[in-house]
UniProtKB/Swiss-Prot annotation:
GO terms for molecular function: RNA endonuclease activity; RNA endonuclease activity, producing 3'-phosphomonoesters. It holds the Pfam family MqsR_toxin. Might be a dimer. Also reported to be a monomer. Crystallizes as a heterotetramer with MqsA, MqsR-MqsA(2)-MqsR. Purifies as a possible heterohexamer of 2 MqsR dimers and 1 MqsA dimer. When the 2 dissociate the MsqR mRNA interferase becomes active. Its EC number is 3.1.-.-. This is mRNA interferase toxin MqsR. It comes from Escherichia coli (strain K12). The keyword Hydrolase applies. The MqsR-MqsA complex is exceptionally thermostable with a Tm of 83.4 degress Celsius versus 48.1 degress Celsius for MqsR and 61.1 degress Celsius for MqsA. The lineage of its organism: Bacteria, Pseudomonadati, Pseudomonadota, Gammaproteobacteria, Enterobacterales. InterPro entries: MqsR_sf, MqsR_toxin. Disruption phenotype: No loss of ability to form persister cells in MG1655, represses persister cell formation in BW25113. Deletion decreases biofilm formation in LB medium. Deletion has also been shown to increase biofilm formation. Deletion at 48h, in flow cells, leads to a reduction in biomass, substratum coverage and changes the biofilm architecture from a 54 micron thick film with microcolonies to one with nearly no biomass and only a few colonies remaining. Deletion abolishes motility.
Length: 98
């Protein structure tokens, strides 16, 4: 299922990241490393997101009650496909070059 509005407000996502309530999947961290970013760099990208970077929201394949917000910010290295899930904290699910 998809929708064109964020499931979680960007201000809430940034608040959680600023509070250190963020984690990442191994694959997202490895992909970010290929772009020259470490975990702190990934968090900085999220803090720098704007509403115009939003692309879509979608449910996970395994559980249609869990929503993932997809952003496509433009970095110096190019455009990034960034997928996050917010339940109790921010989980960076995907972070790769688009």
């Amino acid at each position: 299922m998809e929708k064109r509005t964020p499931h979680t407000r960007l201000s809430q996502v940034k608040k959680l990241v600023n509070a250190g309530q963020v984690r990442t999947t191994r694959s997202a961290l490895l992909n970010a490393d290929e772009l020259g970013l470490d975990f702190d760099g990934m968090c900085n990208v999220i803090i720098g997101l704007s509403e115009s970077d939003f692309y879509k929201s979608m449910t996970t394949y395994s559980d249609h009650t869990i929503w993932q917000d997809v952003y496509r910010p433009r970095l110096v290295t190019g455009q990034v496909y960034l997928k996050i899930t917010v339940i109790h904290d921010v989980l960076i699910v995907s972070f790769k070059e688009k």
